[in-house]
Amino acid sequence: NMSHTNLKKLPTVIKNLKKCVGISNICIDTEGAQLRTSIVKKKIFLKKNKIIKIFKKNNISTNEKIFLYPKFDILSVPNKTKIFVGFDGIILKVINRNKKNKFLIAKIIQAGKLESNKGVHIDKKVYLDCLTEKDNLAIKYAIRQGIRKFAMSFVNSGTDIETIRKIIGYKSFLISKVETLNAIRNLKKISRLTDAILIDRGDLSREVSIEKIPLAQEYIIKSSKKNKTPVYVATNLLETMINDLSPTRAESH
């Protein structure tokens, strides 16, 4: 998972996996078009009503400044926009924009811990490349090592799949991760161009209300089966078993 793997460590990770499972069973999962928090070196708790600055760099975040990556047009985010950090975590509201130094000024409207590498959802569409620079380097390295399985995160359209296909080719096995509303809207074309679909119910719930997730899941599965595309369901399955020996009755379904 390139969202949690340093490029410098990638050769070692691949080498170790190769010994355990063989090269044919290794899959590279891209970061994709998602904003994340940068490194946080110490425990930080941001209290409600605190004012904080938000930048678009991969620097160390503090209790005064939050840095987000990859780069995006930060000034395209208007005032009053809500920014969600992690799941059930910090919620910020943009109250001003510094156009000269290109940063946002936001107010904490829901307190929480600021942690490294947490997914960030902005309540307004911002443009992000479908593959990060890190993704491109990781994919090219993986191909040189003989890896032919890839998962593409935050696929939005068939065009995104065509972009990665130019790098991995059409013989590589591609899993397209459905975790946005755009992916659901473009599902027919995505299903035709990919080898498999993965429903990430966690990230999808940022854009689809939780009570509608089962309906979205059912639609994606039926659509994928109609196109004879294999489909995986992921995130929070058997969550109880992290701490308990058995799942709940609801989870067993």
Predicted features along the sequence, with ranges:
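Non-catalytic helical/linker scaffolds that mediate oligomerization, partner binding
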Residues: N1-H253
